[in-house]
Amino acid sequence: MAGERERGGGHRGPREERDSEFVDKLVHINRVAKVVKGGKRFGFAALVVIGDQKGRVGFGHGKAREVPEAIRKATESAKRNLTRVPLREGRTLHHDIAGRHGAGRVYLRAAPAGTGIIAGGPMRAVFETLGIQDVVAKSIGSSNPYNMVRATFDALKHQDSPRSVAARRNLKVSTLQSRRVGGDAEVVAE
């Protein structure tokens, strides 16, 4: 009994194994300065995106006097802010979406298999940690990494699966998808 407590709390397993399900990407690190009486005091701000590559993703911001501490704080913040995004076939979006934050706007389009991630900078980190394999994305306006990540999350927040749309409209998923194809329900059923 006492041996179980020493190894990490019984059935939970060691902390490293629990956290290994997440992939984290450092999006941006910024050196900031605070002016004090004796001069300038420097610190660092980090922006981290974390995800399980299966539809859960989050971002966090951390500030500290040293870079590793700022990254650790940002990672912890990202783990607290995880959101689930429905994916089509586990590889792309269900439909085209747009998001905005401040002066930054992003447009995300679903793509056929084999397209890859066509996105720049901070958006690519979000898609890689989310588990999206095929997407076309365009950012317009602000190129600030914080605005781009928040605009991408705003767009992903509006992503709906066919199941949730069908439930909202009191329809069956097959009826909804047959309308999308053009009324030919046999094509969808095959």
Swiss-Prot record:
Note one Pfam family from the annotation: Ribosomal_S5
> What region holds the S5 DRBM domain?
22-85
- Classify the source by domain of life: Bacteria
* UniProt keywords, alphabetically: Ribonucleoprotein, Ribosomal protein, RNA-binding, rRNA-binding
- InterPro entries recorded for this chain? Ribosomal_Su5_D2-typ_SF, Ribosomal_uS5, Ribosomal_uS5_bac-type, Ribosomal_uS5_C, Ribosomal_uS5_N, Ribosomal_uS5_N_CS, Ribsml_uS5_D2-typ_fold_subgr
Disulfide pairs here are none
* Coiled-coil zones: none
PROSITE patterns registered for this protein in UniProt: RIBOSOMAL_S5 (PS00585), S5_DSRBD (PS50881)
Q: Whom does it interact with, and what assembly results?
A: Part of the 30S ribosomal subunit. Contacts proteins S4 and S8.
Function comment:
With S4 and S12 plays an important role in translational accuracy. Located at the back of the 30S subunit body where it stabilizes the conformation of the head with respect to the body.
Q: Record's family?
A: Belongs to the universal ribosomal protein uS5 family.
Q: What is known of its domains?
A: The N-terminal domain interacts with the head of the 30S subunit; the C-terminal domain interacts with the body and contacts protein S4. The interaction surface between S4 and S5 is involved in control of translational fidelity.
UniProt protein name? Small ribosomal subunit protein uS5
Q: Which species does this protein come from?
A: Rhodopseudomonas palustris (strain BisB18)
Query: What gene name does this entry carry?
Result: rpsE
